[in-house]
From Swiss-Prot:
Function text: O-methyltransferase that catalyzes the 2 O-methylation steps in the ubiquinone biosynthetic pathway.
Record keyword Methyltransferase present: yes
The protein's annotated pathway: Cofactor biosynthesis; ubiquinone biosynthesis
Cystines in this chain: none
Lineage of source species: Bacteria, Pseudomonadati, Pseudomonadota, Gammaproteobacteria, Moraxellales
GO terms (BP aspect): methylation
Organism: Acinetobacter baylyi (strain ATCC 33305 / BD413 / ADP1)
Protein name: Ubiquinone biosynthesis O-methyltransferase
Annotated CDD domains: AdoMet_MTases
EC number assigned by the record: 2.1.1.222, 2.1.1.64
Gene3D superfamilies reported in the protein's UniProt record: Vaccinia Virus protein VP39
Residue numbers binding S-adenosyl-L-methionine: 38, 58, 79, 124
């Protein structure tokens, strides 16, 4: 996410909402609701978080990063938004979560500093907000140790995802602010798989994240038509 791989409008969206990041009744409610699901999925697929060195790319206000630290990981969260990072730092301090740090730095720049330093790299709900997702994937591959795990999540690009993730989530159910997502930045699983292979990662698992607006319940299932998560591995011995 060097300056060439940052969309200032995307940064501004989340800067404006930063103060609400830890309010579970705000626009960030969906992130709080899905966090236990994605946290458990990452923990399980990575063979545990405790004692691992973890990087969270595009960490925002720290919801996932802090929850991984609470499970015993040594976490660095990075983002290009200053206001969300300030919120994340303050929340970790208030909650006395010591094994976590935050930095405002592009992931590509960090990859030049800390190649092969992390057991686990996560990049969740961010890929659809950057101009060049392939560059992010490559940087994550550089940062993880051989034998380490890299996790991504994003939104598929098809008529169903437009209906559900934009019309439904932003306009009908109002789960998210209008304009949160740009359909043209959504990423098909085939495109994601191609970029993963090109970066030198091995695709291990892909699962869909689903929502029932009547029960307000989220769950994981194989269908990846809308939201989905990806587990990859950097082959080799650490």
């Amino acid at each position: 996410m060097s300056q060439l791989n940052v969309d200032p409008q995307e940064i501004a969206k989340f800067e404006a909402l930063a103060a609400k990041w830890w309010d579970q009744h705000s626009e960030f409610r969906p992130l709080h609701q899905i966090n236990p699901l994605r946290l458990n999925w990452i923990d399980e697929h990575a063979g545990g978080l405790a004692g691992k060195k973890v990087l969270d790319v595009g960490c925002g206000g720290g919801i996932l990063a802090e929850s991984m630290a609470r499970r015993g990981a040594d976490v660095l969260g990075i983002d290009m938004g200053e206001a969300p990072l300030n919120v994340a730092r303050l929340h970790a301090e208030q909650e006395q979560v010591a094994n976590i740090e935050y930095r405002q730095i592009p992931v590509e720049e960090l990859a030049q500093e800390q190649a092969g330093q992390y057991d686990i790299v996560t990049c969740m709900e961010m890929m659809e907000h950057v101009p060049d997702p392939a560059s992010i994937i490559k940087a994550c591959q550089t940062l993880v140790k051989p034998g380490g795990h890299v996790f991504f999540s994003t939104i598929n690009r098809n008529p169903k995802s437009y209906l559900f993730a934009i019309i439904g989530a932003e306009y009908v159910l109002r789960l998210l602010p209008k304009g949160t997502h740009d359909y043209h930045k959504f990423i098909r699983p085939s495109e994601m798989a191609h970029d993963i292979r090109e970066a030198g990662l091995k695709l291990k698992d892909m699962t869909g994240l689903h929502y029932n607006p009547l029960t307000k319940h989220y769950w994981l299932a194989p269908n990846v038509d809308v939201n989905y998560m990806v587990h990859t591995l950097k082959e080799g011995q650490s």
